[in-house]
C-alpha cells in the first residue's frame, strides 16, 4: 500500500541525529516525514543523561547557532551545569549539563510536534526503494510505502543490533527496543563498505540504596551557565549535585578474575568499542597500574531515584556487575535497577559519503549519526542537522553545503569522517581542530547564524536576537576605541588603582583591555561605563585580548584556502598522473576526494603528491581551453 501523499524528505529514526535532521529540513520549508519505531522514544537519551563536554559543547552550540533543538532542550531540562576548563583559554572551555532524561525527551517531542512542515509516523523501516542508483522512498514493517527523493538514515545502534550481558546475547536496538534486522540485510545489499562497532552502558542504581555521605559532592557552577544562545538560567529546572567515588583494589580484583566471562575478552564481541569511553573491564586491563578510577554518580532526573554511575560501563555477567558495584565505597548496599550491557551494531564506512553526507553511490540517500561510525549525542545531532539541511537543499534544487574546517567543528567532524574514515567510534575533541582559537563555543553564532539564515534554518526571533548581539559588539568596540584615558586624571588614577598598571601616556579603553592584567568588568567599573549584555562583553574581551593570535590564524587560513577549495573532477584518473606512486594512486582512487584539501589529509598522501595533482589540474584546464579555442 502507498501512503496517500508524497514527501520531499524522509528521515528514518527519532534519536538525536534524526530529530535534528527532521527539524532542519522542515524549518527550511520542505515537506518532511519523521519515521520512528516508537513515538514515545523520540529524543531519548540512550546512554548517559548529559549533554556537552570538551569538544562536544562546541558542536551543541553550532547546532544551536543553526537553529537546532539540542541546546534549548538542554536548558529546559538541565539539572546541573558546569563550565569545564574554566581556568584555561576560551578556545578549550566547554559547557556540560546533566539533563533530566524525562524532561529532555518531553521537550524534544514538543518541539517536533509543533514544527510546521513536519509529519511524524510510527513504524519501523524495513526497506529502501531504489531505482537506477537513486532513492525513491521507503517501505515500513507493515508494507506501507512512503515516497520521497531524499532519505536520511539515522539508525543509531539499531542496525543489526546485538546486546551482550556476559556470554549471553540477544537481538536489540537498545535495552527494551527491537533491532532493525530487515533494514540491516537490505543495507548490506548496497555497494557500501560495512563494519561492526560496539558501545556500552553501566548498570543503573537505585539512589535510595546509596550512601552519599562517604562520597565527594560535586555541585554545579554559580552563576548557572546556559547552553543555548537563546537560553537563560530562568529556563532551568531545580539544580542538583553529582557525587564522586572511586573503584578500588577489590573492584579491580573482581573484574580481573572474571575477564573470561566478559564478551569483550572471550571473543564474543567483534565490534571495536569507543577508545575515549572504555568499559570498566577495559580500563582495568589497559591501565593495570592504576589503583583506582573515578566514578561519577549522576542523577537521571528530578522525579526518579535512578542514578547513572559514569565510569563503570560493563558487559560482564549480572552477578559480577552486582559484586563490582557493591565493592565501591558508598554503594555497598546498592540495588541495580537495570543491568549494564554492550551493544554491537552495523556502521558504514563514511569515506563512501560526500561532504553533504549523501552517499556517493545512491543519489538522495544520506547518513547521519552512529551509522557513520561516530559516538555521542552531540556528534549525532551535528550530522543530523547537516544531513537534513542538505536533503532539503536537494529537494529545493539548491547547492549542498558543509562548513569548512576553519568555519566549524561540524566541518572538522565531517572532513575527518569522509577523508580518514574510522575504525572505532569517533568522538569530537578540541584537539582535532587546527583553528580552535577561532572555533570557540562562545562565538558559534557569530560564525554560523548568518549562513543559517541564508539557508532558511533561522527564524525571525533568533535572527533579531543575533543581529542585536552582533551590532552590540560592534558598537561597544567602537566606544572602547574612541574613549581615551589620560594619566593624572581621575579616570586614569582609577585604572592605576584597579590594575596596578602605570599610564605613561593616553590609551584608548580598547588598548587597555588588550593588556593581560586588565579585565572588561574591572575596566568598566574603573572608568564608569555602563554594564552591557554579558554575551556582548565576553565577545569584545576575547576578540581584543586574542586579536594578534586570531589575525595570524586568519592569515594562515587565507593562504591555505586557495588550494583547499580546488575541486577535483569526478572522472579524474589517478593512474594516468605520472609521478604518483601506486600506493597514492590507490588511496586517491579509493577515497575519491572532492577537493585538493581533502586529498592532502588522506594518510600517506604527501605534499609532493598534492603538487603533482595541482600541476595535472592546471594542464588539464589548459588542454580544455585549447580544445575550446580550436
Swiss-Prot record:
Q: What are the binding positions for FAD in this chain?
A: 13-18
What cofactors does this protein use?
Answer: FAD
Q: Which Pfam families match?
A: GIDA (PF01134), GIDA_C_1st (PF21680), SAM_GIDA_C (PF13932)
Q: Which GO terms describe its molecular function?
A: flavin adenine dinucleotide binding
**KW Zinc (keyword) present:** no
The record's Gene Ontology cellular component field reads: cytosol
Please name the Gene3D superfamilies in this protein's record: FAD/NAD(P)-binding domain, GidA associated domain, C-terminal subdomain, tRNA uridine 5-carboxymethylaminomethyl modification enzyme MnmG/GidA
Q: Which UniProt keywords apply?
A: Cytoplasm, FAD, Flavoprotein, NAD, tRNA processing
Which biological process annotations from GO are given for this protein? tRNA methylation; tRNA wobble uridine modification
Q: Which residues bind NAD(+)?
A: 273-287
Subcellular localization: Cytoplasm
Q: Which HAMAP family match?
A: MnmG_GidA (MF_00129)
Q: Which family does it belong to?
A: Belongs to the MnmG family.
What's this chain's function?
NAD-binding protein involved in the addition of a carboxymethylaminomethyl (cmnm) group at the wobble position (U34) of certain tRNAs, forming tRNA-cmnm(5)s(2)U34.
- Assembly mode: Homodimer. Heterotetramer of two MnmE and two MnmG subunits.
Protein name from the UniProt record? tRNA uridine 5-carboxymethylaminomethyl modification enzyme MnmG
Q: Which organism is it from?
A: Pseudomonas putida (strain W619)
